Amino acid sequence: MPLNSDKRAYRILISWTPASGGTEPIEYAAWLARTTPVEVRVLSAFVQPWHEVSMQKLGGKYNKWFAQEAKACKQAVKNTLRAAGIPREQWDKEYSVLMDGPSKPQLLTQAAEEFDADLVLLGPNQGAAKGRFLAGSTADSLLHYSPIPVGLSPRAAKLSKHGVTRLNFALTEEQGIDDVPALIDAAFLASTWNVPLRIIVFSSHGLVNAPINDNLDVALELTSQWREHSLGRLDIARERVGERFPDLEIRTEIGSGKGWRAAVDSLKWKKGDLICLGSSPMGALERVFIGWRATELLPHLSVPIIVWPSRKTS
């Protein structure tokens, strides 16, 4: 979510269809609705597999079928939003939209722009393990070009009834401490929602992970240098956030283990945790673009995620 200057509710576009295997993105939206005022709209995208000439031959038959699908989809969306506990006043007037086209990522981007969305929510590939996120083709595309922040939900995530209770920001090597805009965005949300901010550095190599034939002294020296470097980055991050948000509760931690799963699981996570990541810079383009480290990290995160587009420091 970007910084809202007009104080309006956060507009959330949810990617979901009744044929989806789960309701994770709608549950994610309901979780955010328990945290802050939101306005939600559900986009159900139908990808046309047929050539344009074939569509023209179908003519009115296709239009009639599409209208019937849109009506059925709207009823399913209505039932699911209610079941998730999102108050009716937080639904957009046009809360269910069915669109067709050759590309689902393009349809989502178009719909997000038309809705002036602050956030696009996507569910996991249903092949993901419970409590973990696995990107499908649509998520993978948006994570490499979306102009709008992208929210991702692990499969069957257990979320707090009290909404978001802590913001987390992950510093990766690609972004480093120079990724100030995304860090400041996370701090802004934490301050606005009156929740603490935890800034994290992850290492997937463990603090001591030397091969059998390596010199242990060298490994220990490298580990010591990495830890000192990481603590320095965390101190700078804490200082920069503290200057902008002096009343915000800020903690810093290092998650380390042999592999990303162990690094993530080395830290304590709560049902109210939301983790945020920035994007690797793409010149003048303000787009979501995750680097290889973030790509490796995502499948092991067990809490909802927001990935911000890169942008210049304001």
Language-model segments: residues:
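Structural beta-alpha unit
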Residues: 1-8, 64, 79-120, 242-275, ...
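Small/aliphatic-rich secondary-structure junction motif
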Residues: 2-61, 165-220, 242-251, 300, ...
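General small-molecule cofactor/ligand-binding pocket signal
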Residues: 41-43, 92-100, 151, 198-200, ...
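A short acidic, glycine-rich active-site loop
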Residues: 60-73, 219-232
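Glycine-rich, Arg-bearing micro-motifs that act as flexible, cationic patches
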Residues: 119-141, 274-300
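Short beta-strand elements of ligand-binding domains
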Residues: 121-124, 149-156, 278, 305-309
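Short, flexible loop segments at boundaries between secondary-structure elements
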Residues: 150, 295-299, 303-314
